[in-house]
């Protein structure tokens, strides 16, 4: 994934940053699904099986694809809007891809909800893993990956992890 994204984004500065940010967003999505299923397994006896692994692989593909769509628009706008700040370019790119990302995700979510409520019991956990992963993937491709990219571009990467000081009243 890192190699493909670095090759695809070779015309922008620091193409490996795009790949690393996409991988971090993808790991976020996988960890969200695994974490929720760990809680479900502990409290409700939900077991991990081959369908769960299939759902994780599908979530990975969806997450990376959605992130690449956002990053591709950032790349296009960098070439078109030369001279604007990187934050402005990312903001414009997010606004341009937001409707597409939400519409794609909602289409998948409605289909998965129909499968969850009207499908067989054997695929309920598979569909639930997909639902959690698609929601997490949509969120992370829009917000997490872009924030990481902007923070890294501004060399302010560690600011994300710092806690804000409380203001005096």
Which residue ranges define each predicted feature?
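Membrane-spanning helices that line or support transport/gating and their immediate boundary helices
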Residues: 19, 34, 66-73, 77, ...
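Short helix-capping/hinge motifs at transmembrane helix termini and TM-loop junctions
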Residues: 8-12, 40-45, 118-120, 153
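Transmembrane alpha-helix detector for multi-pass membrane proteins
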Residues: 53-73, 99, 104-110, 139-145
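Alpha-helical membrane-inserting segments
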Residues: 3-4, 8, 32, 36, ...
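Hydrophobic alpha-helical transmembrane segments of membrane transport and translocation systems
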Residues: 91, 99, 118-169
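Internal alpha-helical transmembrane segments of multipass membrane proteins
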Residues: 1-32, 57, 105-117
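Pore- and gate-forming transmembrane helices of large, multi-pass membrane proteins
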Residues: 22-28, 81-119, 128, 134, ...
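Hydrophobic transmembrane alpha-helices and their membrane-interface caps
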Residues: 15-72
């Amino acid at each position: 994934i890192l190699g493909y994204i670095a090759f695809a984004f070779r015309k922008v500065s620091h193409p490996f940053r795009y790949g690393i940010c996409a991988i971090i967003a993808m790991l976020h999505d996988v960890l969200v699904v695994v974490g929720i299923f760990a809680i479900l397994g502990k409290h409700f006896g939900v077991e991990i099986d081959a369908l769960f692994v299939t759902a994780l692989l599908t979530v990975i593909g969806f997450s990376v694809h959605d992130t690449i769509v956002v990053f591709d628009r950032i790349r296009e706008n960098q070439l078109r809007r030369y001279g604007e700040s990187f934050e402005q370019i990312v903001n414009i790119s997010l606004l341009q891809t937001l409707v597409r990302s939400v519409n794609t995700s909602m289409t998948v979510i409605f289909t998965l909800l129909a499968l969850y409520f009207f499908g067989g019991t054997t695929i309920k956990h598979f569909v639930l893993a997909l639902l959690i992963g698609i929601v997490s993937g949509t969120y992370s491709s829009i917000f997490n990956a872009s924030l990481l990219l902007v923070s890294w571009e501004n060399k302010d990467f560690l600011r994300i992890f710092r806690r804000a000081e409380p203001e005096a009243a």
